Amino acid sequence: MITTMNEHQKIPIYTNDSSLNIYQNELMNLLAFLKEVHPTFLIDKSLDERISLMATDICNQLSDKVQWNLSKFQVWLNRLLVELQDAHSYIPLESSTLYPFIIRFWEGEFYIHSTIPSQKDTLGKVITHIANQEISFIHKQLSQWVPSENPIKSGISGSYFLNNPSFLEAIGISSSKGMLPMTFKDGSQATFLLEEKPQEMMTFSSVSHQITSPKNVPFHYQIVNDICYFQFNAMIDRLSYQIGCQLMGEKTEENILASLPNFEEFLKTMYAEIAEKQIQTLVIDMRYNGGGNSLLGDILLETLLPEHIAFRAYQSFVRISNYLKETYSYYSTIATGNNQLANTDTLPDIKEWKTRKKSGCRFNGEVIFIQGQNTFSSANYLLTTIKDNRLFPIIGSNTSQRPTCFGDVIPVLLPFTRTKAYISHSHFKRPDSDLDYETTLHPDIFISNSIEEKSKGKDACWDWILSKTL
């Protein structure tokens, strides 16, 4: 998986029918674009008819434009995208009117993450009901309205939309005169009022774990007694940026390049200190890693495995559509039809990857990986490779993504409403194809923290590691 464009590009206008309103035309434009670029239409031949019927039904509902606004329209576009069964392809919702809270999902529970000062007593509280609907019912509804691949992802992504009145209406939650009641696990209740101009919010403050609390950097490490703790938060560095520029046919910007860390230099520094202090245990924490460029995972494995070891790798396929050829100069000369998936093994190597010199550093001690609900995309890709080949033990909780999945998103703009969308153009098959049916990556040892434990600074995974290594 490769992180590509950051700027949203307009999709072509496929439909501009004067008999249709702006939302109807926009819906049909998105449908046509999906059929041109998304690989699932080449894998599931029955999808074309199913999604076309759904689009027709939505289009009929859109005929009364007075009943619709942009936010409600975007909610229904996501309903269409659910049919792709692809957590990478989604549309962020826009709304100027929101309820004054932010909800987050953590290990099966929804809680108040942020709210206005007058509701500060609700911060951190676990929700049991919203407007008399049980949270378990709401969670099930999210999978029908939020692009996802399992209930963990629908909970994570859907929690971002639960302050949006258009989204709440779609999933069957109604409010009276803009008042939304909520009940919490401790038996308390609160009512939130709809606001056009959101006030400044307070955020739930939990106790930070001394070692494992997330740092705002792509990667960092520290030596703790006889353990090297390596927090791997994002698969982005100078090399991945250069590769992205080559794919787009753009020049690298020196100020951006200089601001990014060098992953291989980071590993050299870390391994040098490990050798100096004779550290025998390396813990690699990927619980906060939402992905990036999977090549950083390849670089990491080079330093952890014997040089000539053979293991099963992912099979990666890209749908080289006409749109992709026009947008990415790398694909412009590849002679592959729009209705074919190209195996990436048959494509030419990116110059920066082909010419890189391997660091030559290697760690030969015990390695333990940690995963969690927010391990996603290229991070999930790396850990699935490790799991399917039984390379290293993995502890933690289940991830929010299928190991066999879609990805490599194209950020786009719909032409009439300028709605932003992210659409996948690649398909990834896990090394162990017998497990393609799995909707999450299971750790070897399941260890979970509740929101109550997390708020007190407890980390059950770190406690487990200490119990095994001390």
Where are these regions (language model features)?
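Conserved acidic, small-residue-rich alpha-beta core segments centered on
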Residues: 294-455
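Short glycine- and Lys/Arg-enriched binding-loop motifs that mark or flank ligand-binding interfaces
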Residues: 287-288, 392
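Flexible, low-complexity junctional segments that flank or bridge functional domains
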Residues: 2-282, 288-290, 294-317, 325-330, ...
